[in-house]
């Protein structure tokens, strides 16, 4: 099937202009349905459930074939809603943030929402607050913050992914750090590991203290001692002006080398995240160690790229 393109007409003076946009009324007339029915379906309104599935399929197919584009400005003015959400991330290209963003995008688009993204690049708290205010001025209906700590409650409904704030009106979405720590350490101990090195998270990360507490409590419950000489805290300090995704891998590599240079024997590493685990793995291999034969490596998050590492 040939790709659809917008029709272009020529005016009397030879200039090109776009053909008139297809309206919701045009779609309704094409299907011999009422505009109200078509509107319910295309806007996925609650009343759409009462419309037969085959009719809904016809509406979506016709909207596609006619290249219908909803007028979001008119829609917003009528409903006094923007159908948009603001998303704040530390760094868009960071593997963890990128995966979370992909999920956010898919769900919002399915629900008929658009989104605006801002990256504060782990800069100052002031910049983060400025971005929240900027997004509010863009009339977004809510905020989603990914691994971003805030100190004041936004005026809009907000969800923080990997957040631990107790601010009123803010919902936190976090993984079960306690269960993750127990499962990881139990598995390593079943493999025979007792001297397990640990990468504690960067001081500026929202998950650092929760994951560290979970590891210590899990270790105590399993009768495992976390050795101070095998514990390193990632600095989170950027190589340049701001922290970048590459810095996370580099830091994991650097701290992996530090572990080897200390000379204290260890047979496994429990890293704060997959990015630092991947960096450390490269350091171990470059240092002549086999992974996992000599050193087992595991990290929090389970990002997609970790499944494609060799070894994995």
Task: Identify the meaning behind each predicted range.
Residues 1-9, 14-19, 23, 80-186, ...:
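Alpha-helical recognition/docking segments in bacterial nutrient-uptake
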Residues 1-80:
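N-terminal helix-turn-helix DNA-binding module of bacterial transcription factors
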Residues 5-6, 253-312:
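Flexible loop/turn connectors
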Residues 108-119, 216-249:
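Short beta-strand elements in bilobed, periplasmic/extracellular small-molecule ligand-binding domains
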Residues 131-132, 139-146, 197-200, 242-244, ...:
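Periplasmic-binding protein-like
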Residues 171-198, 213, 217, 248-260, ...:
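Hydrophobic alpha-helical segments within soluble ligand-binding/sensing domains
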Residues 195, 226-230, 290-297:
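Short acidic capping loops at alpha-helix termini that bridge into adjacent secondary structure
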């Amino acid at each position: 099937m040939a790709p659809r393109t917008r029709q272009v007409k020529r005016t009397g003076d030879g200039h090109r202009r776009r053909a008139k946009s297809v309206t919701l009324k045009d779609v309704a007339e094409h299907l011999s349905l009422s505009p109200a029915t078509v509107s319910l379906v295309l806007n996925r309104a609650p009343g759409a459930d009462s419309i037969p599935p085959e009719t809904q399929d016809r509406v979506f197919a016709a909207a596609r074939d006619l290249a219908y584009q909803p007028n979001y400005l008119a829609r917003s003015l009528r409903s006094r809603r923007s159908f948009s959400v603001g998303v704040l991330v530390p760094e868009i290209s960071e593997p963890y943030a990128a995966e979370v963003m992909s999920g956010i995008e898919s769900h919002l688009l399915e629900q008929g929402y658009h989104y605006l993204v801002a990256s504060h690049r782990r800069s100052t708290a002031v910049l983060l607050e400025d971005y929240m205010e900027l997004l509010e001025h863009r009339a977004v209906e809510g905020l989603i913050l990914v691994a971003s700590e805030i100190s004041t409650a936004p005026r809009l409904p907000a969800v923080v992914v990997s957040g631990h704030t107790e601010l009123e009106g803010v919902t936190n979405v976090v993984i079960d750090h306690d269960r993750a720590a127990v499962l990881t350490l139990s598995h390593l101990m079943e493999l025979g590991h007792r001297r397990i090195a640990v990468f504690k998270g960067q001081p500026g990360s929202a998950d650092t203290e929760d994951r560290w507490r979970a590891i210590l409590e899990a270790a105590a419950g399993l009768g495992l001692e976390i050795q101070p000489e095998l514990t390193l805290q990632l600095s989170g300090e950027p190589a340049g002006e701001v922290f970048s995704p590459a810095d996370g891998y580099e830091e994991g590599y650097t701290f992996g080398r530090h572990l080897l240079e200390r000379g204290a024997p260890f047979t496994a590493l429990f890293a704060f995240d997959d990015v630092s685990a991947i960096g450390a793995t490269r350091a171990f291999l470059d240092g002549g160690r086999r992974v996992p034969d000599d050193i087992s490596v595991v990290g929090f998050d389970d990002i997609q790229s970790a499944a494609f590492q060799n070894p994995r």
